[in-house]
């Protein structure tokens, strides 16, 4: 395609989120000269998702392209309701038509959809609740046995959950056209659109629903576009088209995103269309279950041949009758002793100092304490721990209900291996958080940072805590105890961040 240089227009779109850096792409041949750029800033955490910016961006893009490169006479652009054919060919046969040996092999594969070079099977040796039975939050310390895993403090364990038996049963009730005993084969139509590696071998439909399709996902707009295309019942088709339209995005948000309505629950609301979904469209409508990352809470030397994770079981209510359940955390809570699960290790974001004489300040409320349990226990096991070098600031609601690993911390403190500072937000009338304890220890913290080159690590929920902790270091530690002006205090913390002496690992 040729274009005069003075005709060239270019659009640029930046993808990002509230907690991440913005990245952007520009596609341009070297001979092109950019004369104008329309920049659209996109936030994936917007209430309406990427569609809040994608819609006007696409409208602008196609208008510019059509003005520069008009379609041939008689050709018309495809409208938004056009749905492309499925990416792959999906076929199935019943188990009665398969060779017995092949059927046995397919059904005997425990986890056919997880393909990782460093994947290992770990056995559950303890699934312990660390919070009291009366506490609203169920938190689990999951201990797994394995001699094949190598990791360092700060690394994360990747876990891929399964759908609940209840949801799997509901899936086949809502979509009776699919036989749980059938064997499915996925083949490519074009080499440009290869079949994902986990789907390249035949697999059991039941295992696919149990282990691959994310039944708990919140469906996005494209799901409703496809469903509207497949719908035959006019009443359902109209509603699906409304949810798929630009004008219906606020209604879609109120129907799906705000109450956290799952894909399976949406299928239940459109029973006629659900019962007619063709097999070819199964992998267009459903997304794969994603592996979850958990900070490793164990120590290679302190817990040999084991790996531990600390998991808050997600359960909350919206306007919907059924409570909202986190897929992975609730699956973990059901794991029984000796259950073997596939896991693998990824490098974490925390980089702890190798010099054991450098003081380390750790702030980890709630399950944010997990990576620090790994690091502190490792230092203790190697005989390198000391109260003058390890400082843990822990926060929770009640001293007797959700003080995770309480006896371990108190024992380390008694042995002079750890300086422990705790904040219990509900044990007294006035709420008390880790940032309040940081303020109280401002002189100590400034001395550690300014004179002893201490490192700071912050882990936990990303909602308010990380920003408030950072503000406390700027205003009370550097500004108060260090007597630095606000600008200098801010630059001091920024320099720590640049040098890797202030590290944060948070999650939503």
Predicted regions and their residues:
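FNR-like FAD-binding dehydrogenase module
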Residues: 1-508
């Amino acid at each position: 395609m040729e274009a005069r240089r003075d005709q060239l227009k270019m659009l640029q779109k930046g993808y990002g989120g509230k907690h991440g850096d913005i990245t952007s792409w520009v596609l341009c041949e070297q001979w092109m000269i950019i004369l104008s750029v329309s920049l659209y800033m996109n936030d994936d955490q917007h209430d309406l998702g990427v569609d809040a910016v994608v819609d006007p961006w696409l409208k602008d893009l196609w208008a510019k392209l059509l003005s520069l490169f008009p379609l041939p006479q008689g050709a018309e652009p495809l409208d938004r309701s056009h749905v492309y054919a499925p990416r792959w060919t999906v076929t199935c046969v019943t188990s009665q038509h398969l060779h017995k040996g092949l059927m046995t092999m397919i059904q005997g594969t425990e986890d056919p959809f997880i393909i990782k070079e460093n994947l290992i099977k770990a056995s559950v040796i303890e699934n312990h609740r660390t919070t009291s039975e009366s506490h609203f939050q169920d938190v689990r310390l999951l201990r797994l046995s394995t001699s094949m895993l190598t990791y360092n403090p700060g690394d994360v364990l990747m876990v891929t959950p399964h759908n609940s038996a209840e949801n799997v049963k509901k899936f086949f009730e809502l979509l009776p056209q699919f036989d749980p005993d059938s064997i499915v084969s996925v083949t490519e139509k074009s080499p440009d659109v290869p079949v994902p590696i986990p789907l390249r071998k035949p697999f059991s439909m039941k295992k696919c629903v149990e282990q691959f399709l994310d039944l708990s996902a919140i469906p996005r707009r494209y799901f409703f576009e496809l469903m509207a295309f497949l719908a035959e019942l006019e009443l359902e088709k109209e509603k699906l088209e409304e949810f798929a339209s630009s004008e219906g995005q606020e209604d879609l948000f109120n129907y799906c995103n705000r109450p956290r309505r799952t894909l399976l629950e949406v299928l239940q609301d459109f029973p006629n269309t659900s019962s007619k979904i063709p097999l070819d469209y199964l992998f267009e409508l459903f997304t794969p279950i994603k592996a979850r990352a958990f900070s490793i809470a164990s120590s290679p030397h302190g817990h040999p041949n084991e790996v531990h994770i600390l998991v808050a079981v997600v359960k909350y209510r919206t306007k919907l009758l059924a409570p909202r359940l986190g897929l992975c955390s609730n699956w973990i809570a059901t794991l029984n002793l000796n259950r073997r699960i596939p896991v693998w290790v990824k490098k974490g974001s925390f980089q702890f100092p190798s010099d054991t004489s450098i003081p380390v300040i750790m702030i980890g409320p709630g399950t944010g304490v997990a990576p620090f349990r790994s690091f502190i226990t490792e230092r203790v096991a190697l005989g390198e721990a000391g109260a003058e070098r390890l400082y843990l600031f822990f926060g929770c609601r009640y001293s007797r209900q959700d003080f995770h690993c309480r006896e371990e911390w108190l024992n380390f403190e008694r042995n002079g291996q750890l300086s422990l500072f705790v904040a219990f937000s509900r044990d007294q009338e006035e709420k008390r958080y880790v940032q309040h304890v940081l303020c109280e220890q401002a002189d100590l913290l400034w001395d550690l940072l300014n004179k002893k080159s201490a490192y700071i690590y912050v882990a936990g929920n990303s909602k308010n805590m990380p920003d408030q902790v950072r503000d406390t270091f700027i205003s009370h530690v550097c500004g108060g105890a260090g007597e630095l002006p606000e600008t200098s205090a801010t630059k001091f913390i920024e320099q720590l961040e640049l040098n890797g002496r202030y590290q944060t690992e948070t999650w939503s």
